[in-house]
Amino acid sequence: FSAMSAVLNVFPKEKVIINRERAANAYDTLSYFAAKFLVEMPINVLPSVVFGTIVYWTVGLNPERFGYFLCILMLEALTCVCLGLAVSALAPNAEVAQNLGPLPLIVSLIFGGFFINLGSLPAAAEWLPYISFLKWVFESLVINEFTGVTFTCELADPTACAATGEEVLKRLTFTNTLGESV
């Protein structure tokens, strides 16, 4: 989320310059957006990589799957940068951009599968997880970590525990493969 909020003020502050240079045919909008994205990318991806690396090893997740984990985190940060730049470009000023920025994140968070089991959504809302980028991030991270894992359950009722990672994925209603989720 910090990757998105960091770029929300970008375009409103530079609109006058951008419009002047576009009018002078110095470059087109796509070139400016691509250049801005490339400049903002390392600045906003690095904190996610550092934080993710610390958390991954501290929590003790599967060391063999760390590379996939980092790739998923970087894609999430890049998605947030793009979303932030899009909101920034659409907003007439920085204040509006700061107020509109959290809205797509909140919708994505609510329908991302972490707080609500996506299998329990009413029929009218079943389409919302598909537009939630956080659903794809969460699903990818869960699939990455739980595929091929087995657990031992020491409870009196063994059905209370998931015996395999695939059972965890089934309970979360994640039916895609890692490649499909990414």
For the regions a language model picked out, list residue spans one by one:
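Membrane-spanning alpha-helical segments of multipass transporters and channels
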Residues: 1-182
